[in-house]
Amino acid sequence: MSSREKSHHRRHSSPCNSDHSDHSDHSNYSDEIELYSNKHKRDKDLKIEITSRCHSRSSDSSSSRSSSPSSSYERKCKKNSHKKDSYKKNSHKKDSHKKECSDSDHQDKCSFEEIYKYYKYRMLHDKELMVTGSTSYLCMNNNEIVTIPKNYEVKLNNVSLKKNIDLGYINVPYYVREEGVYILFFVINSNQSSQFSFYVNGLEQPLTRYGNNSGAGQLILRTMLKLKKNDAVVIRNSRSSAATVAADLYVGGSLPGNNLTYLMMKIAPYCQPKCEEWDDKHLSKRKLYLFKKLLDKLLLDKDLMLKGFDIHGTFHRSTGVIVTTDTDVPFEATTNVNGLSWSSVVPEKVNILEDGVYKVFFLANTTTAAQLAFFVNGLAIESTTEGINIGAAQVSLRALLELKKGDILTVRNHTSANGSIEISEKTGGKQNDVDAILTVMRIAPLVQPTMDECKLNDYHKKYYYKFKQYLLNQKCLQIAGSNSYWNVTGDTKQILHASESLDWSNTILQENIWHYQGSPKFTIMEDGIYDLFADLTSNQPAQWCVFVNGTADLTTCFGRDSGGARTLLRQFVKLNKGDVVTVRNYEASSDVIETSTNAGGELVGQSVVFMAFKLSPITECVPCLPHHPPHPPKCDSKDKSKKPK
């Protein structure tokens, strides 16, 4: 039989048993009705279950067989639930009084201005950053006669400027309201040998104990300390040789002037923020474009100081000059000037180009008693008047001043007792050195910015840390205060021939500097402009200089024609990574210089101190050229049918 015949036979074979076939069909039909009925019942039960519990699924086998209707009802239920949630969120947005983007918004619904405000707010309140420069500082002076017995505290009666530092009932202690790294300066004008030191929370800081063996000169304490929030700072007569130290007025001139000056300022956070390795490839092109655009706007924001203490400069002279009464000290040269202006045509004046709080310092070697003061726009700042009663010595002034764009700063021989004063040259040695210097640096904006708390969606919030790391890795920025500093001292006798380096036996602080105790060398690890301070007490006239990579930096050479007192050295110096810095006996008049031991008092004192901190980076920030974002903006989520143009 052929296959075609077999197929035909199969199709027509059923009628042979018609009775049995009919019965079988009827039975199958009944079974189908029963099955449908059971299925309908199960579906009905399943609907009830899904309505009461939208997100649960039946685990039994019958429910598994009916998964298709279950999925349909689940989707419908979820859709209704989503509509309710969306309605609640929209209602919450309408009731909200915030003008910023809500967390439920899509990332593209936050404007650039809102994103900028949010990131700026976060940076202003980030304790690891100092995007507005120094946020804690104090400047005080005293114009009354005072006597200070041994172990008694020093009290000053006038506050020139302060921020985030509170004073006790008698103007001491000084309570620090922000933790951080601080530089502290104290000056007393006394006719007696004296020894003073800093105390923190009632405990003496022995490595800050300094003294002078000779009277009729300024004793200057300077140090750098890490202070915690609410620490109490006091200056005390440690154990001076005299039973009581008197600070006199009318020193070097016809005005009372100041016999005591105190200044402190925060230069860095207590701990430097962690700077992770960075690669722009970690970001999408769109996010990188946003970060660059934010940085461009931040650099133009007058509230901020993203480049550190980048407005600075020194103005100095290396030849002698006579300064008559009521005339200003002229300068011959400048070093590392940025954001200030000076002209050799009018060499006495420094022009301020940006508003701000400025730290100003002046130092000169004179052959006679002298009394000088800072002048702004031709008017004396009386609180800065200071002097010395002897010649062959250094006179110094320091202050924090609020200056505005267009102000003119000068140093004037206003009221010296001898009328004209002579600024000497080749002091303490055989070579030309710096005989008068004015240093100027902006430490903070004139007005600290305040902002209300900003809200932003979660998408942009989570990128703040990455944005912070992006800024920390920009070589042209310094958003976390000074990220490189050191403070070292020496308290033992050192005998130095010409060109020999000082050793430093005590390290108080160091950050991003390679140095070990007992070594004369400091290896720089961060490029930048550094503010260098050195106070060096010797028994003979001295001439000191900072050497960089074995070569004298002549802008840092300072001397003093008398022994028994401190020689001050001060300069802003450009240093590169890998540079090696030392302080040496340059070419003093004496063949040998011997440092003093326990000057001015009965306890161990520091005869030499050397400290520095980075003011600003060397690298210039280059603004990004205007360009379009790498991708067009996404469609608004409310109307996804529209395509971007």
Give residue ranges: language-model regions.
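Extended, charge-dense intrinsically disordered regions
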Residues: 13, 49-50, 78, 83, ...
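N-terminal acidic, proline/glycine-rich, low-complexity intrinsically disordered segments
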Residues: 1-12
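Long, low-complexity, serine/threonine-rich intrinsically disordered regions
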Residues: 12-32, 53-76, 102-106
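Long, low-complexity intrinsically disordered regions enriched in small/polar
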Residues: 31-57
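Long, intrinsically disordered low-complexity tandem-repeat segments
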Residues: 21-27, 81-96
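Acidic, Ala/Val/Gly-enriched low-complexity intrinsically disordered segments
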Residues: 60, 74, 85, 95, ...
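Extracellular jelly-roll beta-sandwich "head" domains, especially the C-terminal globular C1q domain
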Residues: 4-6, 106-645
